[in-house]
Amino acid sequence: MQKGIIILGVSLLLTACDLGFPRMTVNYDNLPQGEIKEYITKRFPNEPEKEVLSKLIYAHLDGDNRADSIKKAVSQMGMTCEAGKEICEYSGYIRTKLTGHSSGSGRAKRIYHIVISPKKGMDSLAIEHQIIEDTEN
């Protein structure tokens, strides 16, 4: 009998504690597919690092750092390289929703914009990361 009361008490305590902690749901659907998305999702909630992303790109180059090779590599990884533009881009965002907290909407967009100019080489790689409140439904 006493053992049953202890088990019931522990169960109620765990349930009550679980209800009090904030939870985050994450939606990666608005990131373009590819190796860059995989890298961002593995790093989340941390920001992507330029050095690590550079190494991922270099691994695809096999020592050939010409503009065409860079363009081909980043395209295969999920970046968009439009004809007539000198840059390749990766733009997308992660939506997050925090529940079980007391202030604000709890919804945010983490926007990622990654740019490289294949003609200027790997040193031109730039990563912009911004967090804004998500006001969309």
Q: Each predicted region: which residue ranges?
A:
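C-terminal motif of bacterial Sec signal peptides marking the signal peptidase cleavage site
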Residues: 14-16
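Bacterial signal peptide processing site
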Residues: 18-21
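Immediate post-signal-peptide N-terminus of mature secreted/exported proteins
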Residues: 25-35
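Short, low-complexity, Pro/Ser/Thr/Gly-rich segments in the mature regions of secreted, periplasmic
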Residues: 123-137
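A cross-family detector of function-defining hotspots
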Residues: 67, 72-117
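Terminal, regulation- and interaction-focused segments at domain boundaries
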Residues: 37-77
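Sec-dependent signal peptide recognition
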Residues: 2-8
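Short, linear, compositionally biased motifs with a strong N-terminal bias
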Residues: 10-12
